């Protein structure tokens, strides 16, 4: 009820202004009596995945807390894991505004943010100060002005800086809002990137005395053959997990709706079915060789269960959280 009232107010604002205000309020309320608006005690539903123990299988997807400013607040909401980022080596402003749009009747969002963030060093400082009990994932990407042929270097820089502080590292090569980025999902480019990341992981594991798993985040806009090739690369390079999926460029199910024509990636309920199909295809290809984190339209217990039945061990929410609030996390965890 409280969130429904808050949402009514937030939805009167421009989508990005509402997002920024929510982040500021989470920072302001954290550790004060006002955090009772979102703090919740949830039952333990432990899951072993990628060598880590998650207190429950429901996580916050990357993109909501790009700079790691609200880890403690999201931890207080009961998430089993929180993924911050996407973060890049250098700060960058992202794409021109407006760049975030609600498709309310479809419970969807279109964004063309463009990896706006304050840089990896800023994020690391925030992570070092935060106190939390959930697993922390850090999602890494490349700067817009880094040529795609040099993209691996950006991922390696970020990986080196976040390794010591991450529970796992998510490698984002599937955002549609950085020109050329999705080309890293294919063929030799993917193999070379994963090989370099794996070598860096071994080097950092020895240096820090701990193994931090790597998960690759992929797009929903892939053919079955492309998914099969990605799976071959994941297995060949001993990657620890795969996150499926990012946002879609497809507008078929929202055609004619307000804002549906806007450029960018579409998330929420409109991508639910396709992302679940990608999870199912990944599971058919991978079996138990590596775990799948399912994300895309997880807006209810039923949607979460469908992802798990398709083969996901963990699920993440983002757009569903915008529309339904912390109660969504509670409903999924309690019904598992």
Curated annotation (Swiss-Prot):
Q: Which Pfam families match?
A: DHO_dh
Q: Which residues bind FMN?
A: 62-66, 86, 139, 172, 217, 245, 268, 297, 318-319
- Residues of the active site: 175 (nucleophile)
Which EC class, in a word?
A: oxidoreductase
Note whether ATP-binding occurs among the keywords: no
> What membrane topology does this protein have?
Peripheral membrane protein
Q: Does the keyword Glycosyltransferase apply?
A: no
Signal peptide residues are none
Q: What is its EC number?
A: 1.3.5.2
What reactions does this protein catalyze? Answer: (S)-dihydroorotate + a quinone = orotate + a quinol
GO CC annotation terms, alphabetical? cytoplasm; plasma membrane
Q: In which pathway does it act?
A: Pyrimidine metabolism; UMP biosynthesis via de novo pathway; orotate from (S)-dihydroorotate (quinone route): step 1/1
Which biological processes are named by the entry's GO terms? 'de novo' pyrimidine nucleobase biosynthetic process; 'de novo' UMP biosynthetic process
Which co-factor is required? FMN
CDD domains noted in UniProt: DHOD_2_like (cd04738)
Q: Which InterPro entries has this protein been placed in?
A: Aldolase_TIM, DHO_dehydrogenase, Dihydroorotate_DH_1_2, Dihydroorotate_DH_2, Dihydroorotate_DH_cat, Dihydroorotate_DH_CS
Q: Which residues does the record give as substrate binding sites?
A: 66, 111-115, 172, 177, 246-247
Q: Name one GO molecular function term.
A: dihydroorotate dehydrogenase (quinone) activity
> Which compartments does it reside in?
Cell membrane
Q: Which UniProt keywords apply?
A: Cell membrane, Flavoprotein, FMN, Membrane, Oxidoreductase, Pyrimidine biosynthesis
Q: How is the cofactor bound?
A: Binds 1 FMN per subunit.
Question: Function of this protein?
Answer: Catalyzes the conversion of dihydroorotate to orotate with quinone as electron acceptor.
Similarity comment: family membership: Belongs to the dihydroorotate dehydrogenase family. Type 2 subfamily.
What is its quaternary makeup? Monomer.
Q: Which NCBIfam families match?
A: PRK05286.1-1 (NF003644), PRK05286.1-2 (NF003645), PRK05286.1-4 (NF003646), PRK05286.2-5 (NF003652), pyrD_sub2 (TIGR01036)
This protein is called Dihydroorotate dehydrogenase (quinone)
Naturally occurring in which organism (per UniProt): Vibrio campbellii (strain ATCC BAA-1116)
